[in-house]
Curated annotation (Swiss-Prot):
Segments crossing the lipid bilayer: 11-31, 51-71, 76-96, 101-121, 134-154, 162-182, 206-226, 251-271, 274-294, 302-322, 334-354, 363-383
Signal peptide interval: none
Molecular-function annotations in GO: transmembrane transporter activity
Gene transcribed to yield this protein: tsgA
Family designation: Belongs to the major facilitator superfamily. TsgA family.
Any GO CC annotation of this UniProt entry: plasma membrane
The organism of origin for this protein: Serratia proteamaculans (strain 568)
NCBIfam families named in the record: PRK03699.1
HAMAP family: MFS_TsgA
Membrane topology note: Multi-pass membrane protein
Keywords associated with the record: Cell inner membrane, Cell membrane, Membrane, Transmembrane, Transmembrane helix
Protein name: Protein TsgA homolog
Length: 394
């Protein structure tokens, strides 16, 4: 594979994470406007976004096998057609059924693209470089989280229709589509297999279970927190939509900076120990945010939370890939799927909590989930295999 083609595939991976990040993160910003558009309470409206998360989950789960049947290039080109149809449906459709269908399609496209992006990084890069590349790729999720809430706030403040926010997100897929046209993709399945090398199956071990639970709790906690921050800030502290949007943007800006910093720092530390410390710090920072009565402190606490939690998810995935001597794409995909289940459950879990106890109750629940991540990381220390495989500094 030549360097220019590798660079194009790497940028496809970057954009794939940005696309998923944008779709998932702007939900909290546009939810109120969409609820008003369909004359529904916000807590009821949040349930329809489960279609987006379900689409992401189903496509990531199925694509572990579909990638070996349908060429990656064809999947991405077909995804572009689906993306155009879904955004057109959001703009032209007036029913809740059409909205839910379009959200599901956007989820499917996003999940397929992100699973391909993750595969490309794990396929093209190995060892220490894989971990840092995955972390940098994941930073584009955060970058989208920094940019698109600002874009959404600008559009909504000017009374521009909420569906234009999704049209702006669609521009990311235009970039993916153009790069795809000029790229050569690795071949999977029997055509790409080396017939001369037997496949050796390794047992995953109980450490993978702890990592999977941690991944699920982390994503559910993170999204359950960040999706309800705008609602919490406006209702509890009387902020306007721009101020609430800035809080979300502050979180993802700090998160992105943290990813860049930790991509250099992590190689000097044992991954299990550092992720345990980061989970403890993140739990503490979220507790400070949830418990403070001073609106001026919210920005400081949410930036601290973003920074210390930035490396947790990617480190969990990297630790998962190091639980076997030879990295297993299916193992990585399994942990990624568990994280995506957390995404899908976001509004299923937090919707009823908000309906009964308000946004503050959802944030407190998210804090409890972060505590569960810390416990899982602590337990992992007793069973992890990454040290015995000589992967301590990866």
């Amino acid at each position: 594979m030549n360097d220019s083609n590798r660079l194009r595939l790497t940028w496809i991976s970057y954009f794939s994470y940005a696309l998923t990040g944008a779709l998932v993160i702007v939900t909290g910003m546009v939810m109120g406007n969409i609820a008003e558009y369909f004359n529904l309470p916000v807590s009821s409206m949040s349930n329809t976004f489960t279609f987006l998360n379900a689409g992401i989950l189903i496509s990531i789960f199925l694509n572990a096998w579909l990638m070996e049947i349908i060429p990656l290039k064809r999947q991405l080109m077909f995804g572009f057609v689906l993306m155009v149809l879904a955004i057109a449906g959001l703009m032209l459709g007036k029913s809740l059924t059409m909205f839910s269908l379009c959200m599901f399609i956007l989820g499917v496209v996003s999940g397929i693209t992100m699973s391909i992006g993750t595969f490309l990084i794990t396929h093209m890069y190995a060892g220490r470089q894989r971990g840092s590349r995955l972390l940098f790729t994941d930073s584009f999720f955060s970058m989208a989280g920094m940019i698109f809430p600002i874009v959404a706030a600008m559009l909504l403040a000017r009374q521009i229709g909420w569906y234009w926010v999704y049209a702006c997100i669609g521009l990311l897929y235009v970039g993916i589509f153009v790069l795809t046209l000029f790229s050569e993709f690795p071949v999977l399945g029997n055509k790409g297999a080396d017939a001369g090398q037997p496949v050796v199956k390794e047992k995953w071990g109980i450490g993978v279970l702890f990592l999977s639970i941690a991944a699920l709790c982390y994503i559910l906690g993170q999204l359950g927190f960040i999706q309800w921050v705008p609602e919490y800030a406006t209702k509890s502290f009387g902020m306007d939509i721009s101020q609430a949007g800035k809080l979300v943007s502050d979180f993802w800006t700090s998160y992105m900076i943290g990813m860049w910093v930790f991509s250099f720092i992590l190689r000097f530390f044992d991954l299990q120990r550092i992720v345990t410390i980061l989970a403890a710090l993140a739990t503490g920072a979220m507790y400070l945010f949830v418990s403070t009565d001073n609106p001026e402190h919210l920005s400081y606490y949410i930036m601290a939370l973003g920074f210390v939690s930035s490396a947790i998810y990617t480190t969990l995935i990297t630790l998962g890939s190091l639980q076997t001597k030879v990295s297993s794409p299916k193992l990585v995909n399994f942990i990624l799927t568990c994280g995506t289940i957390g995404t899908m459950l976001t509004f299923v879990v937090t919707g009823p909590i908000v309906a009964k106890g308000g946004a503050h109750a959802a944030l407190t629940t998210a804090n409890g989930l972060y505590l569960a991540v810390f416990v899982m990381c602590l337990l992992l220390g007793f069973v992890t295999k990454h040290r015995s495989h000589g992967h301590v500094t990866h």
